[in-house]
Design a protein with these regions (language model features):
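Short glycine/proline- and charge-enriched loop/turn segments
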Residues: 8, 129-135, 186-191
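Active-site nucleotide/adenylate-binding loops and adjacent lid/helix of ATP-dependent enzymes
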Residues: 13-93, 153
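Phosphate-binding site of ATP-dependent enzymes
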Residues: 66-139, 143-147, 175, 180
Length: 244
C-alpha cells in the first residue's frame, strides 16, 4: 500500500498532488477522483480540471472538455513536464480554506470561503486583485451550517494523523452539494494565510514567532563521518569477510 511506502514529508516537500490524493483515498477521506495523464489520446466526456502534478498557486490549472486540448497543453507547456493530473469538474462547488498550526498546541483558524470571479479559484483571484491573497475577496468566517463546519474540522484532525505536519499551513477543501472533499495541502511560504487567524487574536508576528520557536525546539540530528573513508570496505577481500 502507498501509505507504507511513501513518507508524508515527500508528499509535502514535492507538492505532489497525486501522492497526496492517493494517501487521502487510501485512508478513507473523501477526494475527487484524479487520474495521471500523458501525451496519449484521451477520451474525455464532460468538463475536467487539468493540473500540473507538482506545484501550487493555481498555476497551470485549466478547465478542459476535450482530449485534444489536454494533449496540446501538456505537450507544449513546461508546467506539465513533470506530470499532470485531471479530475472531474464540480460545477458550482465552493472553495473552503482553513489554517492549521502545530505549536505550541494544535489549533485551527476560522474557515474562509474565497469569493472567486471565474469558474475556478484562479491565480488572478488569489494574487493579482486587491493587493494579493490577503486582500482578495472572501467570506471570513465562512457562513456554513454547523454540520459542514464540524465535518471539516473532523477531516482536518484525521489528515493530521496521516500527515503530521509542523508549523503553519493551510488545507483547501471543496464543498459540492453538501459533500465535502479534501483538495490539497499548502505548506509553502505565502500559503500560510496568516490573515485566517486575525479574528482569533493571533497577530502575524505571534504566529511567525511560534514557527521559529517550534523550529528551535526540534531535535537536531547529528551525523557522523565515521566509516565514510571506505577503509573497512577496501580491506575486505570478499563478501564473506564483509558480513563477518
Amino acid at each position: 500500500m502507498l501509505r507504507s511506502l511513501v513518507g508524508s514529508e515527500m508528499c509535502i516537500r514535492d507538492r505532489d498532488k497525486y501522492v497526496f490524493y492517493t494517501l487521502m483515498k487510501e485512508n478513507g477521506l473523501p477526494v475527487i477522483e484524479k487520474k495521471l495523464i500523458n501525451t496519449e489520446e484521451l477520451n474525455i466526456d464532460g468538463n475536467y480540471v487539468l493540473k500540473p502534478r507538482f506545484g501550487g498557486s493555481s498555476i497551470g490549472v485549466e478547465l478542459i472538455n476535450d482530449g485534444a486540448t489536454v494533449q496540446k497543453l501538456i505537450t507544449n507547456s513546461d508546467l506539465y513536464s513533470q506530470g499532470a493530473v485531471i479530475e472531474k469538474y464540480l460545477e458550482n462547488s465552493i472553495d473552503l480554506l482553513i489554517g492549521v498550526r502545530s505549536f505550541p498546541d494544535f489549533d485551527v483558524s476560522e474557515i474562509e470561503k474565497p469569493l472567486k470571479n471565474e469558474t475556478l479559484f484562479s491565480y488572478t483571484d488569489k494574487y493579482l486583485e486587491n493587493g494579493g491573497l490577503e486582500g482578495s475577496k472572501r467570506e471570513l468566517p465562512a457562513n456554513l451550517n454547523e454540520q459542514i463546519e464540524k465535518k471539516l474540522i473532523e477531516m482536518v484532525n484525521k489528515i493530521n494523523q496521516i500527515i503530521p505536519t509542523r508549523g503553519i499551513y493551510r488545507y483547501d477543501f471543496l464543498l459540492h452539494e453538501n459533500a465535502l472533499y479534501i483538495n490539497e495541502i499548502n505548506t509553502i511560504p505565502g500559503s500560510h494565510a496568516l490573515y485566517l487567524w486575525k479574528n482569533l487574536n493571533s497577530s502575524k508576528f505571534e504566529l511567525l514567532d511560534s514557527m521559529i520557536d517550534e523550529a528551535l525546539s526540534r531535535q537536531v540530528d547529528n551525523w557522523s563521518l565515521t566509516g565514510s573513508d571506505g577503509i573497512a570496505l577496501k580491506s575486505a577481500k570478499d563478501i564473506a569477510s564483509k558480513l563477518g
